[in-house]
Amino acid sequence: MRVLYIHAERFNWEPRDPALDIRDEPTSGNANNALVVFTSVERGDVPDENFLRAVASDIIDVAKKVKASAIVIYPYAHLSSDLARPYTAREVLNKLFEVVKSQFNGEVLKAPFGYYKAFEIKCLGHPLSELSRSFKPEEGRADRRAEERRDYYVIITPNGEEHDPAKFNYANYGDLKALVEKEVFRKELGGGEPKYLEYLRKFGFEWEPMSDAGHMRYAPEATVMMELVEDYSYIVAKSLGIPVFKIRGTNMFKLSEKAIESHARLFGERLYIVESDTDLILRYAACFQQFAMAKDWVISYKHLPFGMLEIADSYRHEQPGETVLLFRLRRFYMPDLHIFTKDLKEAMEVTYKLHEVIFREIGKLGRTYVSLYNVTEGFYKNHRDYLVELARREGKPILVRVLPGQKYYWVLNVEFHIVDELGRPREIATFQIDVGNAQRFGIKYVDENNQIKYPVIIHTAILGSVERYLYAVFDTMAKMEKEGKVPRLPTWLSPVQVRVIPVSKENLKYAISIADVLEAEGIRVDIDDREETLSKKIRDAETSWIPYIVVVGSKEEAEGVIAVRERGGGQYKIRLEELVKKLKDETRGYPQRPLYLPRLLSQRPSRF
């Protein structure tokens, strides 16, 4: 933040034309014997109370030294070339005004933000009448650290005992220990190159070098995996046993909309801004679209609870050096489910089932979660038994972070972490109980007494983002390899489920007939018709992690059977209909997608 102090005998201003979509009411004003604070809010400035107290303290100190009887906060964009976004600047100026007003024993005024203004000023011309300052948010950092220390952590066991994380016995809880070291004691995460990164290339998960940092591209194998997870997220959402409405919408929203602006402020500087005729933000989750739609629905208490799901392309401006393939991205896909409930009691009841499904789904990968429950102090005091019940359902201790104050739109924010092959906690799934956004966006329902009420909203990503779910899948493969096992993707998620390899050209027709049958059953199958040796074809299929390799020669054709090499499961001969049944059994309850590649390997470019 840059400021110019002018001690003025008199100062007046009058708004003329709007300069921004985001603006205050156009009020005129004047002051005598005033310290005029021309203020430019810069990128990186935040509406943090400790930072603003530091700025206000300097303003008031100067006002006292020059014996000013009034202070005027005047938005002035011409002191810096690195300005904050309008919504941030406006919030910072408004909060600075409130802090100065609460501490200065005199008149405090503020000129409106977002206008071209005419002003007249008469500077008093003494040695302290013209001063400049530059402030950085770091100046309030020590106070912020002290405020953060008012947050506290406890470990709650399934029988309701409460423990200090520093004194807890972690002998049987290695994953919890890893989470506590990261979250409570801020220890550095384990180093080293994660093994899963080696796997991604073969499936076509890559950075896009011609885009912004943190943006990926997805080859055909990666694309089918992504879309299968997207499809599966809807199946999982419906398994909650409530009505679920799947929607689609835009990824850009106007910052001039009050609800959008106030919600965006909660997210801070990680926003993607698009400069057009008006300032737009790229959504960081599906909240904006779903809430904008729900506010137009006529909802009765009889409809609740219900869910809205969108596979939202989401944008978060992560630091370039922090982006990681599949895990921390600037653009990703979020199967974002919002569940609308009558009140907090019903929301808590719904989350019991939600909690069960979240653990069920990670369990299907052979993994489990270690949980961090972020709660407001009021929720913790009033609903501690609810947290104990969730710990009981998990069958192990949970970490709880208690946050004082009411500065959050949620009362509960749960993070579900796996511990990766390097021993690092990695958040995958989540849910929140939101008590603020229904009112912010004007989402209402009519209760049984014909009264208008605001629903309590559960935000959840049951599987996590699409990419993070796949990250968990590939990290599981890394753990398998570390344990000396053969990594094997779930059959439903394998880009190619069966590869048919004819021993010779004479067997190609039979191979095609086998592929036709499998394809008709919704199985993703391809044929290696290249002019390569049989051993190389088998080796390439194994390197590609194909779950089932079918080798057919003249003998198999004569006998009407197929020779199968199952990944991690040996070799055997069976009839084709038996293989179809086996694949159907393995993929029951999961979505189907066709092959996104030419069926014949000879038709693929060398990248494949």
From Swiss-Prot:
Q: Which cofactor does it need?
A: Zn(2+)
- Cross-referenced InterPro entries: aa-tRNA-synt_IIb, aa-tRNA-synth_II, aa-tRNA-synth_II/BPL/LPL, Anticodon-bd, Anticodon-bd_dom_sf, DTD-like_sf, Thr-tRNA-ligase_IIa, Threonyl-tRNA_syn_edit_dom_arc
> Which terms in the GO cellular component ontology are assigned?
cytoplasm
Q: Where are the residues of the annotated region Editing domain?
A: 1-143
Residues covered by region (Catalytic): 194-490, 195-490
Self-association and partners: Homodimer.
GO BP, sorted A to Z: threonyl-tRNA aminoacylation
Q: Which domain of life does the protein's organism represent? A: Archaea
- Read off the CDD domains from this record: ThrRS_anticodon (cd00860)
| Keyword hit for Metal-binding | yes
Q: What is this protein called?
A: Threonine--tRNA ligase
Q: What class of enzyme is it?
A: ligase
> Which compartment or compartments is the protein found in?
Cytoplasm
Q: How does the record comment on the protein's domains?
A: The N-terminal domain is an archaea-specific tRNA-editing domain that hydrolyzes incorrectly charged L-seryl-tRNA(Thr). Catalysis of tRNA editing is performed by the charged tRNA itself.
What's noted on cofactor binding? Binds 1 zinc ion per subunit.
The yes or no answer to whether the keyword Transcription is present is: no
SUPFAM superfamilies, alphabetized = Class II aaRS ABD-related (SSF52954), Class II aaRS and biotin synthetases (SSF55681)
Select a single GO molecular function from the record's annotations and give it.
tRNA binding
- For this UniProt entry, which residues form the secretion signal? none
Q: What does this protein do?
A: Catalyzes the attachment of threonine to tRNA(Thr) in a two-step reaction: L-threonine is first activated by ATP to form Thr-AMP and then transferred to the acceptor end of tRNA(Thr). Also edits incorrectly charged L-seryl-tRNA(Thr).
Similarity annotation = Belongs to the class-II aminoacyl-tRNA synthetase family.
